[in-house]
Amino acid sequence: MTHIISNKPLTIEKVNEIILNDKKLELSKESEAAIIKCRRFLDSKMGDIGRPVYGVTTGFGSLCNITIPAEDLSQLQHNLVMSHACGTGETVRPEIVKLMLLLKIQSLSYGYSGVQLATVQRLIDMFNNDILPVVYQQGSLGASGDLAPLAHLSLPLIGMGEVTYKGEIRAAAEVWKEMGWEAITLQSKEGLALLNGTQFMSAHAVWSLIQAERLSDWADKIGAMSLEAYDGRIEPFYPQVHEVRAHKGQIDTAANIRKILEGSEIIKQKKVHVQDPYSFRCMPQVHGASKDAIAYVKGVIETEINSATDNPTVFPDEDLIISAGNFHGQPIALPMDMLSLAMSELANISERRIYKLISGQRGLPHFLVAKPGLNSGFMIPQYTAASIVSQSKGLCMPASADSIPSSQGQEDHVSMGANAATKLVRVVENTERVLAIELFNAAQALEFRRPLKSSWTIEKIFAKYRK
């Protein structure tokens, strides 16, 4: 199966489909033409440009006022990629590196970057053959693009760096030899086009959004099972309540939980308690707020992954080469910090439901075992959940609240969006672990409601989980 790279907007769903189905990439004829046209325009300007063009005929960052001789322009780009590959820390997981490749290819395909067609094609070759550069998590300020990680992504193009291929980390030069590929000789601006961009941040955001939508759905299902196990009330989920406070996420969550619990004997039985704790009763408001946040962030990220984010931007039709700031990560740094909060809150409220289920209330035994004392039962899973939730709260300190000037003050405001991106992944993973612990507790607690049955949906989840 093949996905054609074109001007047709990518959606999060389409990206997920490409990755899950291991689709190959191919440039549309229109994209090929746009890339070639932009490169030819840039080449035509090299002889009579008449003025310095940042990163094309000059140095980089605070070295922007140093003019580079024409005979050194290719070496300039080669040196840029080498000098900026200064990442450190843990390596980025292969599935996110593959997303980085896809998003970089998409961004370059619009024909505003001035790269050679051969450069984009080699990136496609790498994607299609699962030859994934070794990229490190630390090093990007999220402005001037994701310089260090994108340098590591680009090193293999020039026959340098390391790649993961067939489960092994190997020198790119060795793999290139096996594949019969030649190293790319970068032309003017190409190194900058490869390094200036937000694909490190965007790839982490896309991965996190895919998981966030899945976990948001599971939070409703697991929360509904906990509500049943706790012998909770259905009235707080009635549509009338939410019509008078019409946040979409809230309305959708209430409707979802009503549907999940449809046909339950437990929810229909007479209740002796007047109301439930907030962690049960306010699921529509809390889960719903996270749904709304996910939807907002999704819209922003979909705009970003369909954008040209390098600098300078080349406009052949307008006869313009403009040095500007589309590399700056602020537009996605703020939403990624927001998504961390949204996912952390799903874990936060989940942990509170876990706590209630083991508290010996509403006919449930202490710690969900028949002989508490002799057995500690489900005591410690709640400790684990509390520890994870506490960690996520710390990770929710907004990375985008910080900025440290760099490059001798030329780059005097940065987004720190890459830090927002990497900690977002950790928060998402933490949330999944906490929801898994809640499911563990809810399934055990549900046993104590027998012989009453829950809904068909809950019983199906229960049976599959217990199996």
What are these regions (language model features)?
Residues 121-128, 148-151, 155, 217:
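A broadly conserved amphipathic alpha-helix scaffold signal in soluble, globular proteins
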Residues 49-51, 66, 253-254:
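Polyanion/phosphate-binding surface patch
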Residues 54-68, 72-76, 83-108, 136-158, ...:
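FAD-binding core of FAD-dependent oxidoreductases
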Residues 2-50, 77-135, 227, 242:
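Glycine-rich, flexible loop motifs
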Residues 72-75, 119, 212-214:
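Short, low-complexity, polar/charged sequence segments that are solvent-exposed and flexible
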Residues 2-23, 27-34, 38-41, 46, ...:
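C-terminal auxiliary extensions adjacent to catalytic cores
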Residues 135-140, 317-321:
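Cysteine-centered functional microenvironments
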